[in-house]
């Protein structure tokens, strides 16, 4: 099983993210901590809903910053099935430390695991569906992430088996309708972008027709996004473009716009290299976790 924690640098800003999340939860006095004090306690962290466990390194950092000892019983990316237990829950981790520290860490850690596991689970479901049809290309998320949570959400897509797509505006140039309208044409937009991004950064162009896609390919775009095409129209356009430019131009075709678990199969074809969807991370249901002190 891949060790996704290795993606997170030792001195990375993700640790500061955790500090900020804890500070957001207790910006001044911890009144609840005063009530319970610092007696040594043990607690169980439960998962109460079937799904893929994700967010463990981030939750571990919460516990580390709260000076707690944790024993994880499952690895990142494990698929948990508490529904098979009579109790309807499963112990994911055991936590030891001062009572006030455990309760300080509780909600932040649970929120991280719930959100991250929800995204990983949705990603796992949609990539599994695609693979079950024989499709071997890429299923990706989008940049429509929650402000302040992009690192966590993109990480969760990877754990679930999907591609993150571009991480930010600096990772890849994506020229959409507004860029094209502002510059006058797809050709102008691609030319202007290439002048500053150089050879190392890819350029993607959002296209609404085969003619626009052809212009983008001729202009030197690396990725052609066929946006909001319908199933049969998408497949015909993709096949036409691949046949026309075979051996002449190298580019990738991406399909985007309204894709989700319910309709993806209608759009899948081998001529499309990438399918991108925000459904795996935007408005995604969370996975239910809880934490209880031993008593």
Curated annotation (Swiss-Prot):
EC number: 2.4.2.19
Residues annotated for substrate binding in this entry: 107, 142-144, 166, 176, 206, 227, 256-258
Matching InterPro entries: Aldolase_TIM (IPR013785), NadC (IPR004393), NadC/ModD (IPR027277), Nicotinate_pribotase-like_C (IPR036068), Quinolinate_PRibosylTase_N_sf (IPR037128), Quinolinate_PRibosylTrfase_C (IPR002638), Quinolinate_PRibosylTrfase_N (IPR022412)
Pathway: Cofactor biosynthesis; NAD(+) biosynthesis; nicotinate D-ribonucleotide from quinolinate: step 1/1
Origin superkingdom: Eukaryota
Subcellular location: Cytoplasm; Nucleus
GO annotation, cellular component aspect: cytoplasm; nucleus
Alphabetical keyword list: Cytoplasm, Glycosyltransferase, Nucleus, Pyridine nucleotide biosynthesis, Transferase
Pfam families per record: QRPTase_C, QRPTase_N
Listed GO MF terms: nicotinate-nucleotide diphosphorylase (carboxylating) activity
Biological processes per GO annotation: 'de novo' NAD biosynthetic process from L-tryptophan; NAD biosynthetic process; quinolinate catabolic process
Reactions it catalyzes: nicotinate beta-D-ribonucleotide + CO2 + diphosphate = quinolinate + 5-phospho-alpha-D-ribose 1-diphosphate + 2 H(+)
Assembly, per entry: Hexamer formed by 3 homodimers.
Note: Present with 2660 molecules/cell in log phase SD medium.
Known role: Involved in the catabolism of quinolinic acid (QA).
Similarity remark: Belongs to the NadC/ModD family.
Protein name: Nicotinate-nucleotide pyrophosphorylase [carboxylating]
Species this chain originates from: Saccharomyces cerevisiae (strain ATCC 204508 / S288c) (Baker's yeast)
């Amino acid at each position: 099983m891949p060790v996704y924690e290795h993606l997170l640098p030792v001195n990375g800003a993700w640790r500061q993210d955790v500090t900020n999340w804890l500070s957001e939860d207790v910006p001044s006095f911890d009144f609840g901590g005063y009530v319970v004090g610092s007696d040594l306690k043990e607690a169980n962290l439960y998962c109460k809903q079937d799904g893929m466990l994700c967010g463990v390194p981030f939750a571990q950092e919460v516990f580390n910053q709260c000076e707690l000892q944790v024993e994880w019983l499952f690895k990142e990316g494990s698929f948990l099935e508490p529904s098979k237990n009579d109790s309807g829950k499963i112990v994911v981790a055991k936590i030891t430390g001062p009572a006030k520290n455990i309760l300080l860490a509780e909600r932040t850690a649970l929120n991280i695991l719930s959100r991250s596991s929800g995204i990983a689970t949705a990603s796992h479901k949609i990539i599994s569906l695609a693979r079950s049809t024989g499709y071997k290309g890429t299923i990706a998320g989008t940049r429509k992430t929650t402000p302040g949570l992009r690192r966590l959400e993109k990480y969760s897509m990877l754990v679930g088996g999907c591609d993150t797509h571009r991480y930010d505006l600096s990772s890849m140039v994506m020229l959409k309708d507004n860029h094209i309208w502002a510059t006058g044409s797809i050709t102008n937009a691609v030319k202007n972008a290439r002048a500053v991004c150089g050879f190392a950064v890819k350029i993607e162009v959002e296209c609404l027709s085969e003619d626009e896609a052809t212009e983008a390919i001729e202009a030197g775009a690396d990725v052609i996004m066929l946006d909001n095409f319908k199933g049969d129209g998408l497949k015909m356009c993709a096949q036409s473009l691949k046949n026309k430019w075979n051996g002449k131009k190298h580019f990738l075709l991406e399909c985007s716009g309204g894709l989700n678990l319910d309709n993806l199969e209608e759009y899948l074809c081998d001529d499309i290299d990438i399918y991108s969807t925000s459904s795996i991370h935007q408005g995604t249901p969370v996975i239910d976790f809880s934490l209880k002190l031993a008593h």
